[in-house]
Amino acid sequence: LYKDRQENAAVHQLFKVQHRAEDMEAELLAIVDNGGRVQTILIEHPVYGEIQTYLKLTCRRDVQHFLQQVASCAFRPLSELTDGVHYHLIQADSQQDLDYVEAALRDLGFLQE
């Protein structure tokens, strides 16, 4: 069957969040479990300005692999430079999925308005 290309277009939204380092797993799983894909993390550093890197986390397996990498090295999360405040660019298949992600982050107390 033919589907309109617009129907398959992904949507994106930038979410501002804040949490402790030990809440990283809960945050990332809330995103992927609600249909979101974590594209980037970005912080606003007072001296260096915006610092951004790609994460490309699309499922629980990606999140677990990322968390294992974090745990296996002397790594401090980027968000520690800004007291846990950071942004994620989230991609999803629909606006409804982004709304689910937003609600989950709000319910966890991570979403910053």
Regions found by a protein language model. Name each.
Residues 1-5:
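Minor-groove-contacting beta-hairpin "wing" of winged helix-turn-helix DNA-binding domains
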Residues 10-113:
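Mid-protein regulatory/catalytic core that forms ligand/cofactor-binding pockets
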